[in-house]
Amino acid sequence: LSYRDGRYFDFVKEREFQFPLANIYNHDPIYGKTGTNLANQMTDDEFKTYLYMMGTRGTAFWELYYSPEMIDEGQKWDINAEYLEWAKKNYHILKNAKLIGTTPDKGNTYGYSCWDGEEGIISMRNPSASVKTLSFTLDRNIGAAESLKGKTLNRTTILNYKTTDAQTDYQTVKYGDVITVTLQPGEARIDRKSTR
């Protein structure tokens, strides 16, 4: 994840590409033996996190480079099916992805903020070996609609990986709030924000 996500930051922040992240073509996901060192490397939870984090990049083209003998490990076929159904159902939100945080190339926290109207999905990840925070303002700069001003947004969990703090669904935030999240080493979170 970190290498490819680092390229996204390079494209957007350094090279200033001016097109939607959904239009970037990737050879992803890859979970195969040929030309990789991936054999038997991901647990089911790691594989699920890998897929869902990639989904928040906003792309709709999935090549599924899998070695059958590797994808047969654990519940990976079921996880793949669950993920593809989720990505299709939520593509109207995911396709509007924007970067948050800073490049993972240097071990920094980052994620993607995806919105469609008053409904959003926000991913957050700490690729480093130490506890770090990620802060962002919930506003139009990360894709949240200005029509959310004055409204309360509920948070529901889509994915938690290596999360240690007690989280509960329906924590509330408002447009303009600064959200600061402490992320454990290797932790990833994906939340839905909506007025429902």
Q: Locations of the language-model features?
A:
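C-terminal beta-strand-rich structural cap/linker in extracellular carbohydrate-active enzymes
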Residues: 167-196
